[in-house]
Regions:
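Positively charged, small/polar-rich N-terminal and surface patches that mediate targeting and assembly
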Residues: 1-44, 49-94
Length: 94
C-alpha cells in the first residue's frame, strides 16, 4: 500500500482485513511508525476476534497503543504518537 503524505506528516492506514493472515501488516505498519485503524466488520465474528487478539498481543510486544473506537473499530498507534480521546479533551462522549 503506497499512500502519499505531506512532508513531515504522519500516515494513518485503514485496514479492513477478512482473515487472520492479513493482521501481520498491522504490526509491520505500527513498527514503521504508522498509526493503523482496524475495522473488522468485513470479517466474521470469530475471525474478527482472532484479528483483534493478534493485533493487541503484537502491540503489547512492541510497546504500541491500542484504543477501541467502537465495537468493530480499533486504533493501533506507535508509542511516540500522541492520541487524545474525547474524554481526554473534556468532551461528552455520546
Amino acid at each position: 500500500m503506497n499512500i502519499p503524505m505531506a512532508a513531515g506528516g504522519q500516515e494513518l492506514l485503514v485496514f479492513r482485513p477478512r482473515e487472520l493472515r492479513d493482521a501481520e501488516q498491522i504490526l509491520l505498519s505500527v513498527r514503521a511508525n504508522r498509526a493503523v485503524v482496524l475495522h473488522t466488520a468485513e470479517a466474521g465474528d470469530g475471525e474478527a476476534q482472532r484479528l483483534i487478539d493478534f493485533a493487541c498481543g503484537g502491540m503489547e510486544a512492541i510497546g504500541g497503543q491500542v484504543h477501541r473506537i467502537d465495537a468493530e473499530t480499533f486504533l493501533f498507534a506507535p508509542p511516540q504518537v500522541c492520541v487524545q480521546l474525547d474524554d481526554d479533551l473534556g468532551r461528552q462522549v455520546a
